[in-house]
Amino acid sequence: MPHFKFYYFDVRGRGEAIRLLFHLADEKFDDERFGMEQWGVLKSEMPLGQVPVLEIDGVKISQTTAIARYLGHQFHRAGTNAVDCARLDMIAEVIQEFMSSSGMGKFSRVLLGMIQANKEQFFKENVLPDVEKYAPIVEKFLLENGNNGLLLGDRETWVDVFAAESFSKLIDYGSPDALDAYPHILALINRVFNHPNIKKYVSQRKATPA
């Protein structure tokens, strides 16, 4: 197995799904967390001048979905054929689009105080409209897979983890009832976060502001 080193801020943000994939697979990695001051030094060392970044035996890979997809294949948490892999990529693109949408894309910066706004009001006025646009799409994919709490097949894939982490932040940082209208997404979150390996990690994970 390669030596993995993962670079991201000391928050969940866009990096937590990557950490969860390592814990799901029970694979060791160096979890390099840092603040803004240290980031000023590290930035020039990153391929695109941004994080998350995964270093694999000295080779750095950037972009959340590229890293998650690689780990999905590395840990046998991807599709078993080309069509299934393409379907997972399709769903991942929807999740990534949601995370980069006008409201959700700014919400972490609001939580961290980088954008001055009332958190509750911003969530209601800017994030919930994004949820109403994208959550029904993911809900449909989950229902089409047989209502087993997964997006494809009967075993957690990298996209299940990516989606569960992305949507769970709506409840953890936004509103407890943010996903009440989407029972299949709630079932996905419940299934992923109750996997023994992930459950153990989350039980020991420190709270972060975003």
UniProtKB/Swiss-Prot annotation:
Its EC number is 2.5.1.18. PROSITE patterns: GST_CTER (PS50405), GST_NTER (PS50404). InterPro entries: Glutathione-S-Trfase_C-like, Glutathione-S-Trfase_C_sf, Glutathione_S-Trfase, Glutathione_S-Trfase_N, GST_C, GST_superfamily, Thioredoxin-like_sf. Residues 81-210 form the GST C-terminal domain. It comes from the Eukaryota. GO terms for molecular function: glutathione peroxidase activity; glutathione transferase activity. One of its GO terms (biological process) is glutathione metabolic process. Glutathione binds at Y8, W39, K43, G49, Q50, V51, Q63, T64. It catalyses: RX + glutathione = an S-substituted glutathione + a halide anion + H(+). The keyword Transferase applies. Keywords: Transferase. Residues 2-79 form the GST N-terminal domain. Gene3D superfamilies: 1.20.1050.10, Glutaredoxin. CDD domains: GST_C_Sigma_like (cd03192), GST_N_Sigma_like (cd03039). The keyword Lyase does not apply. Conjugation of reduced glutathione to a wide number of exogenous and endogenous hydrophobic electrophiles. Belongs to the GST superfamily. Sigma family. This is Probable glutathione S-transferase gst-36.
